A protein has these predicted regions:
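Classical eukaryotic N-terminal signal peptides for Sec-dependent ER targeting/secretion
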Residues: 1-15
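Soluble FAD-dependent oxygen oxidases
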Residues: 2-6, 21-566
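Hydrophobic h-region of N-terminal signal peptides that target proteins for export
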Residues: 14-22
């Protein structure tokens, strides 16, 4: 822990900042400023966290300077990247395209800038490490970033000229049959550190005969940004959103205080942490999730090919007409449509998760849709697998390492019910306009809708939605800056107006998988909850220590979170 002199120095600076905080004139300290911490102070911080302070570098620099060059398998491995403090899954979030000149570090580059990567990282192993890091950032007026694994589609886990707190080493997993919340028995649960990836967590739960609601990406951290954004799952139609099933958080807030947060203790912050946006509330060090008895399930993967965009659109209209067929089965499904440029065709891959039924029953459930869809395309692959659900949702790794941005919308159940043919027109228009992939997620309805009574920061649109649809936009390292800008803006400029035909306007989106340039993020990500979230933000983070792209309070700061603009 820090000594008395270090802590007194922090306190004096904090008191000064509290007096001098003056809106638009207020900026964070950056290298070159007279008040930027000296090497001696960084060394003191390193001693205080037992030598766990490291310099953060972009992943390309890590590979060239520290690893002797990364293989293709390493570069595209999310598990590999999670171990690199400065790495993000999508490499574009490590770049600073906007500065003049830009600060960029690309794979195999001989000239690397720091980009959007933090200056230093604390590889925290204890709550005390986190508290010291937050206190140091506050005392020295530094930009602060928090990263669990780097599985982040809006660049919220990294920040230029910042100090990063990495929770990757919080690998604790504790199961309890009778978890207590403020003395009350909340039932079977698991407490998970904010560094535990899902592939580890699901297998640990299997050993206990348990399952919990979470995603299917191997390196997503259940207790990280995933749960703060709400957390959808292939099990959501059966069991609800992840945020519907969280019982407690352990969090370090902006004043370096460690809190247990639940329905009875700091209930306002508990409300905000369940859907109020990733990275805005503090450093979560653990979360406790309700668990359920594990069960057998059938997973299926069906692949179809369509010759052109009209045929693909017809398949998707057919899918929309059949989507309620599976309600009684509580089926979750990922339906991904994409262009196959090598075959000059369009593909649809449907990965379905059927709880507690056999493969024959699952095949029978899909058959009416597939029979109708074959009028417009060809089935080129079909697999059914009976398995334990923990194995069904476990993946080994995630393929990453590209330059990719997203845009998304929640699609109301009423649109599927009343206008299923419109889905065909929308898919055709999107691909005709140059879309590369449209990723559908049947992760709403069922228990998600039934849980509308739960008072949390989840956008109310989740309770009336049927699906969550994402568009992806990517580019090569060789792409010009002007073209990168066009691609980054493609969702709002050309794709969203088409998608709104089924999403409505103003629509809603899942804030973890969305466009960081969303113009009205308050409405789109948070809806009527935003005023209450803003009030809670002022209460727990009055100085804006935890500012992220399109997060609560971010409109009061510039794009880098370095200077106030209000």
């Amino acid at each position: 822990m820090a000594g008395p002199t270090f802590l007194l120095e922090q306190l004096s600076v904090v008191l000064f900042l509290c007096v001098s905080f003056t809106g638009a004139n207020y900026c964070r300290t950056v290298p070159g400023d007279p008040s930027f911490p000296s090497a001696e102070k960084w060394n003191s911080l390193n001693s205080s966290v037992s030598g766990r302070l490291v310099k953060a570098v972009p992943s390309a620099q890590f590979c060239s300077n520290m690893h002797g060059g990364c293989t293709d398998a390493e570069w595209t491995s999310a598990s590999f990247r999670a171990d690199i403090p400065g790495a993000m899954d999508q490499v574009n979030w490590e770049q600073d395209y906007e500065s003049v000149p830009p600060s960029i570090c690309l794979r195999n580059s001989t000239d690397c800038g720091q980009g959007n990567v933090p200056l230093y990282a604390i590889l925290a192993e204890s709550v005390e490490d986190v508290q010291i890091g937050v206190a140091f950032s506050s005392a020295h007026n530094l930009r602060l970033a928090v990263k669990a694994s780097g599985h982040d589609y809006l660049g919220r886990s990294t920040a230029r000229n910042s100090l990063l707190i990495s929770t990757h080493k919080f690998q604790n997993i504790t199961f309890a049959e009778n978890f207590t919340v403020s003395g009350h028995n909340a039932g079977s649960a698991v407490t998970v550190g904010s560094g535990v990836p899902l592939n580890t967590l699901y297998q640990a739960a299997k050993e206990q005969g348990k399952i919990l609601v979470s995603g299917v990406a191997a390196t997503v951290v259940a207790a990280g940004g995933y749960i703060q954004g709400g957390g959808h799952s292939a099990l959501s139609p059966l069991l609800g959103l992840a945020a519907d099933n969280v019982l407690e958080f352990e969090v370090v807030t902006a004043n370096s205080t460690y809190l247990k947060v639940n329905e009875e203790e700091h209930a306002d912050l508990f409300w905000a942490l369940r859907g109020g946006g990733a990275g805005s509330w503090g450093v979560v060090v653990s979360a406790t999730f309700r668990t359920f008895p594990t069960f057998n399930a059938t997973t299926s993967l069906v692949s179809m090919v369509a010759n052109d965009t009209v045929a693909l659109g017809s398949i998707m209209a057919t899918h929309a007409k059949h989507i309620f067929d599976w309600d009684d089965l509580s089926m979750g499904q990922y339906f991904y449509a994409y262009e196959n440029t090598t075959a000059d065709a369009y593909m649809l891959a449907l990965a379905s998760y059927f709880p507690r039924i056999s493969s024959d029953e699952a095949a029978a459930a899909l058959k009416p849709f597939l029979d109708d869809a074959e009028q417009f395309g060809q089935i080129v692959g079909q697999q059914f697998n009976e398995t334990n659900i923990n194995d069904g949702v476990t993946t080994v790794d995630d393929v990453v390492g590209s330059n990719t941005v997203l845009g998304s919308r929640l699609i109301p159940a009423s649109t599927y019910r009343d206008h299923p043919d419109t889905f065909g027109h929308v898919y055709t228009q999107l691909f005709d306009a140059g879309a590369v992939a449209v990723l559908g997620h049947l992760v709403a309805g069922g228990k998600v809708s039934e849980n509308a009574y739960i008072d949390s920061a989840i956008h109310p649109a989740w309770r009336t939605a049927k699906t969550h649809i994402i568009l992806t936009n990517s580019w090569a390292d060789s792409t010009s800056l002007s073209n990168i800008s066009s691609i980054q803006n493609a969702f709002k400029d050309s794709q969203l107006p088409i998608l709104e035909q089924i999403a409505g306007s103003p629509g809603a989106a899942y804030s973890n998988e969305a466009d960081s340039l969303e113009e009205d993020f308050k409405t789109t990500f948070f809806g009527p909850n935003y005023p209450r979230l803003e009030d809670i933000k002022r209460r727990y983070d009055p100085k804006g220590m935890f500012i992220v792209a399109a997060g609560v309070g971010s409109d009061k700061w510039d794009r880098d979170g370095l200077c106030r603009v209000d």
